[in-house]
């Protein structure tokens, strides 16, 4: 069973390493380059015209890697895995439309705010509704109407509030990754770490599944998660695909993921969190995305209330650029912060299991 995880990760890595330069040539030939805002850091002006919509590469690589791992190992796809992939692809489609309009109209704003929000809501609602269907033999659906941290806890919120909660998570994570994607490799590297964490979480939940309670040494701490191993397969495919894409996306970037990629990655993170019953834990596992999002909230709130800005520029990474930090220095230090968030998050995940011994 574990071979699926290995195959999906390796195939995802290979496909983006080999496929991304082909996409770069195609986008460059069509003139699909990034528009750079004039009010941003001066160093970014040299990036104008760099091919964007690179998220196409790792979206396709992830989907192909997932299904190839199934063909090679003989296992069938699960509803949980397909739902996460569908959420990723749907959010990626919204981002693609946004990127395409930016390129065609040669402006930094693509879809109108209402249209972009409507697209994300349609995809998010479809995911949330379907995630409460398809119960397995143990009665577990891909998602649960109970809130979760390292697993479900006692608060049942019902299907309507769950849909609202799921929408909040999807929008928050998607736009969090989108805001983080402002420096070469920053969002890609950070996302790779979080998907690595979810690969581990999926494997651990599979090994400690309540479906195998009779063979567990600590059955009281088992996990009621549908298809945990398949969630690990999806996470591994995403980790490998992002890692391969990082080769081309790191400074100086040969391609940007665009909203196509950032919305897709955020959707995948939210989907994995919801289906693995780690909805609140993802705020720590993806701590860098939360931190950068909060910097924008603080900046906007402060300016509207007091007329003053807290940071030289938001999102946070640009504040440090304007303080004189090089782009690479900001990226590496923010990666370190993200790595620490993942370590602490996984530590809490394990502690939640160990506390039930």
Curated annotation (Swiss-Prot):
Gene Ontology BP annotations: cell division; cell wall organization; peptidoglycan biosynthetic process; regulation of cell shape
Keywords attached to this Swiss-Prot or TrEMBL record, sorted alphabetically, are: Cell cycle, Cell division, Cell membrane, Cell shape, Cell wall biogenesis/degradation, Magnesium, Membrane, Metal-binding, Peptidoglycan synthesis, Transferase, Transmembrane, Transmembrane helix
What EC number(s) are associated with this protein in UniProt? 2.7.8.13
Location of this chain's protein in the cell: Cell membrane
**Record's PROSITE patterns?**
MRAY_1 (PS01347), MRAY_2 (PS01348)
User: What PANTHER family has UniProt attached to this entry?
Assistant: PHOSPHO-N-ACETYLMURAMOYL-PENTAPEPTIDE-TRANSFERASE, PHOSPHO-N-ACETYLMURAMOYL-PENTAPEPTIDE-TRANSFERASE HOMOLOG
Q: What does this protein do?
A: Catalyzes the initial step of the lipid cycle reactions in the biosynthesis of the cell wall peptidoglycan: transfers peptidoglycan precursor phospho-MurNAc-pentapeptide from UDP-MurNAc-pentapeptide onto the lipid carrier undecaprenyl phosphate, yielding undecaprenyl-pyrophosphoryl-MurNAc-pentapeptide, known as lipid I.
What protein name is recorded for this chain?
Phospho-N-acetylmuramoyl-pentapeptide-transferase
| Gene name in the database record | mraY
């Amino acid at each position: 069973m574990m071979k699926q995880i290995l195959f999906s990760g390796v195939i995802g890595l290979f496909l983006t390493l080999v496929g991304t330069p082909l996409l770069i040539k195609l986008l460059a030939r069509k003139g699909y380059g990034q528009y750079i805002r004039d009010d941003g850091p001066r160093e970014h002006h040299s990036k104008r015209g760099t091919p964007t919509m690179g998220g196409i590469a790792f979206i396709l690589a992830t989907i192909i890697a997932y299904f190839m791992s199934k063909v090679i190992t003989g296992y069938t796809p699960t509803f949980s895995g397909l739902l996460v992939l569908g959420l990723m692809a749907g959010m990626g489609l919204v981002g693609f439309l946004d990127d395409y309009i930016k390129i065609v109209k040669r402006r930094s704003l693509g879809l109108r705010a209402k249209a972009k929000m409507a697209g994300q809501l349609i995809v998010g609602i479809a995911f949330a509704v379907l995630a409460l269907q398809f119960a397995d033999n143990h009665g577990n659906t891909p998602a649960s109407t109970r809130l979760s941290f390292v697993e479900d806890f006692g608060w049942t919120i019902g299907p309507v509030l769950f849909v609202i909660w799921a929408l909040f998570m999807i929008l928050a994570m998607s736009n969090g990754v989108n805001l983080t994607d402002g420096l070469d490799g920053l969002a890609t590297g950070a996302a790779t770490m979080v998907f690595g964490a979810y690969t581990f979480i999926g494997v651990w939940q599979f090994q400690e599944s309540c479906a195998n309670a009779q063979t567990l040494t600590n059955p009281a701490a088992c996990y009621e998660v549908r298809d945990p191993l398949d969630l690990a397969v999806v996470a591994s495919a995403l980790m490998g695909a992002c890692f391969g894409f990082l080769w081309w996306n790191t400074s100086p970037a040969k391609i940007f993921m665009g909203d196509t990629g950032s919305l897709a990655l955020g959707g995948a993170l939210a989907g994995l969190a919801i289906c693995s019953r780690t909805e609140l834990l993802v705020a720590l596992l993806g701590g860098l995305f939360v931190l950068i999002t909060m910097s924008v909230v603080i900046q906007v709130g402060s300016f509207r209330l007091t007329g003053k800005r807290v940071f030289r520029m938001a999102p946070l990474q640009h504040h440090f650029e304007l303080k004189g930090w090089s782009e690479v220095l900001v990226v590496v230090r923010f990666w370190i912060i993200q790595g620490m968030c993942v370590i602490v998050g996984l530590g809490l995940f394990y502690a939640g299991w160990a506390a039930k011994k």
